[in-house]
Amino acid sequence: MLQPKRMKFRKMFKGRNRGLANGTEVSFGEFGLKAVGRGRLTARQIESARRAMTRHIKRQGQIWIRVFPDKPITSKPLEVRMGKGKGNVEYWVCQIQPGKVLYEMNGVSEELAREAFTLAAAKLPIKTTFVTKTVM
């Protein structure tokens, strides 16, 4: 699972997921999976989608993961009264804004890349679209 090696502080405020994304262009590969909606991806969802793509392309080509889960999400145990401090870190998430490129792929045909990204998109909780690299 993806998570930071070390952080200055273990727990984080909830914050808000507003604004526009950085990393909106396909920069490493030929094809990309771009977020259309707004939301957050857990480390498990990112890994699950990566595995689905890797299996479908049968380890040909190359895949880049353009997102990293760097925000800790805490929760208190079941049946615990309110108060007594913030809960323990349960999992890590990456906040996604519209336009963010999540994955990139290279070295495979467009048809195969499109199928692989469709499988990956089924694992993710946000709407996505298939994009290709634009040549300037």
UniProtKB/Swiss-Prot annotation:
Domain of life: Bacteria
Pfam annotation, one family: Ribosomal_L16
Keyword tRNA-binding part of the UniProt annotation: yes
Keywords associated with the record: Ribonucleoprotein, Ribosomal protein, RNA-binding, rRNA-binding, tRNA-binding
Keyword Iron-sulfur tagged: no
GO cellular component, one term: cytosolic large ribosomal subunit
InterPro entries: Ribosomal_uL16, Ribosomal_uL16_bact-type, Ribosomal_uL16_CS, Ribosomal_uL16_dom, Ribosomal_uL16_sf
GO biological process: translation
One function term, GO molecular function aspect: tRNA binding
TM ranges: none
Gene3D superfamilies, per the entry: Ribosomal protein L10e/L16
PANTHER family: 50S/60S RIBOSOMAL PROTEIN L16 (PTHR12220), LARGE RIBOSOMAL SUBUNIT PROTEIN UL16M (PTHR12220:SF13)
Quaternary state and interactors: Part of the 50S ribosomal subunit.
Function description: Binds 23S rRNA and is also seen to make contacts with the A and possibly P site tRNAs.
Family: Belongs to the universal ribosomal protein uL16 family.
Protein name: Large ribosomal subunit protein uL16
Organism, as annotated: Shewanella loihica (strain ATCC BAA-1088 / PV-4)
